[in-house]
Amino acid sequence: ALPICVKRGGAAALLFVVLTLAGLPLLAGGRGGLGLLSGPSVGFIIGFPIAAFVTGWMMERVQMNVLTSSFIAALTGGVIALYIPGVIGMALVLDKSLLAAFGLVSAFVIGDLVKVIICGFVTQAIYRAQPDKVLSRA
């Protein structure tokens, strides 16, 4: 959602969730269907369009250079805004504390932080090559 607008990023992520819940095998392992709503990843599924919206919203509002704006937007939307509903959903489904649920997903945090860094550099490269392809923050 970094190089595209809030509405398009959020809508694309929402469409992905709707198609997945409709049964298309779009998740890892070919998973899809309404049964996902009763599994431990329900919060991440619900949080996916929220994360895309927050990422685009942050990219529009953070008034710094593209690299820094991208890092902040990807961290805020792609990690924080995704992990909050994800951990809450996992805690509820598994009947665990929030801390215990976070412990279950903590192994993924480092990888997601690496993706934040990569995303920032990719967005910066796109901006340098084709500035009109990256979300305007003016």
Model feature map: region roles:
Residues G9-A13, L36, I45, S70-F71, ...:
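Alpha-helical transmembrane segments and their helix-entry boundary regions
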Residues A11-L19, A73-T76:
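Central hydrophobic cores of alpha-helical transmembrane segments
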Residues A12-F16, L24, A51, T55, ...:
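Alpha-helical transmembrane segments and their lipid-water interface positions
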Residues V17-A51:
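Interfacial aromatic-anchored transmembrane helix boundaries in multi-pass membrane proteins
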Residues G43-L75:
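Internal catalytic-core helix/loop-beta-alpha segment
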Residues V62-R137:
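Membrane-embedded alpha-helical hairpins and interfacial helices in multi-pass inner-membrane proteins
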